[in-house]
Amino acid sequence: MAKEKPHVNIVFIGHVDHGKSTTIGRLLFDTANIPENIIKKFEEMGEKGKSFKFAWVMDRLKEERERGITIDVAHTKFETPHRYITIIDAPGHRDFVKNMITGASQADAAVLVVAATDGVMPQTKEHAFLARTLGINHIIVAINKMDMVNYDEKKFKQVAEQVKKLLQMLGYKDFPIIPISAWEGDNVVKKSDKMPWYNGPTLLEALDQIPEPPKPVDKPLRIPIQDVYSIKGVGTVPVGRVETGVLRVGDVVIFEPASTIFHKPIQGEVKSIEMHHEPLQEAYPGDNIGFNVRGVGKNDIKRGDVAGHTTNPPTVVRPKDTFKAQIIVLNHPTAITVGYTPVLHAHTTQVAVRFEQLLAKLDPRTGNIVEENPQFIKTGDSAIVILRPTKAMVIEPVKEIPQMGRFAIRDMGQTVAAGMVISIQKAD
């Protein structure tokens, strides 16, 4: 059987109005992946003219977005010769950050869209830094709106240089920088004849070369639980996605923080595993599975618990413990001070956490300390902080298990900050 093409998740990032939506629209339009209903509407109108058709389609997509219907994520799958690509989050989503950290939407790569007319803008920096914080290791740069600078090579080189500086400072290496016009369709899917000075890949070709994400099978087993079901004749079936490690029938697993909270090990032997109603002998990272554990009841575990092997159980941070984290403040109306207690979202858990100490403020671009023990931190700041959970939760240092070490901080219905765990300080 031929090996299936790898699936790759990408996000589009970049400053507002630099053309993220148009670029996505052009990719879908030129690969014939625009939602049926929209194409049908267009054909019913019997309109002429190709460039007009793209403009019309973009207007419809925009209307749908403004009515709160973001292009259904199911439509944003498309194929390249060697990859299945899913655009997991289009721009403009309020919950973009939270989705990226807690959802099924760990991105493998980001497309950073920068307008040739403006160059690097504040949000360009913020989004690039965020991609870094969220552990996106592969980036593709699209310098858009080349039609508005007359496809000028000098202008392209100037903006490319700015972007290069920014990304190298954040530790990115080897990223393609592609001059495109999403509106005119240059170098998105089809090679442009208007920029003979450029001989690199089109955006689609660059997407086709995204490295296949490695599966973290050698890391300790971690399965954050999404739901718990009781199934007649089977028993209790926790459901979740394997983040790291491998689960096999016959393994002995323990659930945390359930075991810590109940002061007794909630553990047992794995009797069966299934995915999409098919029985499995073993499950790997990325697999969404249901599994049954001998002796574990429906009321013993819940969403937010994490399963791991008893030989290397999930790390629990209790209210008497603290953890050190690096955060970037994305959106706070005033300022964050010691004592602030918002809700932390990581994998499938949500726990209120208290800011115990503000250790240092960092330069978001270089990571260097600019101020020790600041009195407060505000939107745009990056900082090292000490956090204390109000109840026991599982979280891991990002260096050990990156999939379990990233989090979003939410308050007042919005994502206030994003961060990663540096280390855990146990009280005993």
Swiss-Prot record:
It catalyses: GTP + H2O = GDP + phosphate + H(+). It is found in: Cytoplasm. GO terms for cellular component: cytoplasm. Residues 68-72 are annotated as: G2. GTP binds at residues 14-21, 89-93, 144-147. Gene3D superfamilies: P-loop containing nucleotide triphosphate hydrolases, Translation factors. Its EC number is 3.6.5.3. Residues 89-92 are annotated as: G3. The keyword ATP-binding does not apply. Mg(2+) binds at S21. PROSITE patterns: G_TR_1, G_TR_2. Residues 181-183 are annotated as: G5. Keywords: Cytoplasm, Elongation factor, GTP-binding, Hydrolase, Magnesium, Metal-binding, Nucleotide-binding, Protein biosynthesis. Residues 144-147 are annotated as: G4. GO terms for molecular function: GTP binding; GTPase activity; translation elongation factor activity. Residues 14-21 are annotated as: G1. Residues 5-215 form the tr-type G domain. The keyword Hydrolase applies. CDD domains: EF1_alpha, EF1_alpha_II, EF1_alpha_III. GTP hydrolase that promotes the GTP-dependent binding of aminoacyl-tRNA to the A-site of ribosomes during protein biosynthesis. HAMAP family: EF_Tu_A. Belongs to the TRAFAC class translation factor GTPase superfamily. Classic translation factor GTPase family. EF-Tu/EF-1A subfamily. This is Elongation factor 1-alpha. It comes from Thermococcus kodakarensis (strain ATCC BAA-918 / JCM 12380 / KOD1). The gene is tuf.
